[in-house]
Amino acid sequence: MTDRTAVDPASPRLLAAGQRLDWHALTEARKQQRPRRAFVVDGDAVGSVDEVHLSALQPWGRWIEVRAEAVVLTASAAERDAVFAEVNARLHEQGLIRAWRDEPFPLLCPRTGQVRAVFERACARFWGTLTLGAHCNGWQAGPDGQAAGLWIARRSATKATDPGKLDNLIGGGVPFGQTPWEALVREGFEEAGLNPDQMARATPGRVIELNRDVPEGRQFERLHVFDLQLLEGEQPVNQDGEVAEVGLWPVDQACAAAATEEMTVDASLVTLDFLLRRQLLAPPTAAALEERLARLCTAAP
């Protein structure tokens, strides 16, 4: 990727890039085309299961009841982790759960944020359960102090999801036992080589909720957005091999890329949140995009 030259964030090029209303990610964020049945734990709908996969759950009727209105987990709280370990391993063998990662993720109640069980990360999309993500817009100021450049990463071609697509400087899922902030600090080093003192400068944006069909099932995710200004001389360097390259893009070029399928849906929405909060898009287009993005934002836990 090519580093920027100084770009005025009020330049005509930025305004032109900001005229687009057809942001791919805004349409994709809630696209639901496959029929799914609610997945209920302790009386709360915590996810959903694709109706074509309901028959695969029949062998575990002792713990998982497939009812007309919902799939209900009847296993006790003490049994759940072991039940999920057994069931998910078999579903993985059958090819219904893909991209196994050996990362424990919490099964969260969307209403309360409480943890109802712990299972393998890759299983969340089969069950359509809520996951949390932490993403960070890395930005650099121009001579006037306004955002002139955004650090944009390209995902490794070997990534399990969205290989080779453009991404935010930092982004990742929040595993069991970590908060979004703690996950962000960890990912800051793994993905960009930034230490905790540098990451401490990050400031929060909004929380964006996706609930959409994906090849693995259903992505039901709350993205916690952060911004981090990188100072002159601070150069991100990937540490974990999950980033193919990273570069500093003029804001107008980052905006144009984020509006297309070249960038992941998650990263596109996180980038748009940054552009809107910092008033970098031309009105009245900004107002129309803000109205659409605001519908995706949540104050839920």
What are these regions (language model features)?
Residues M1-K165, G172-R186, L194-V237, V251, ...:
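N-terminal leader/linker segments that precede catalytic domains of diphosphate-processing enzymes
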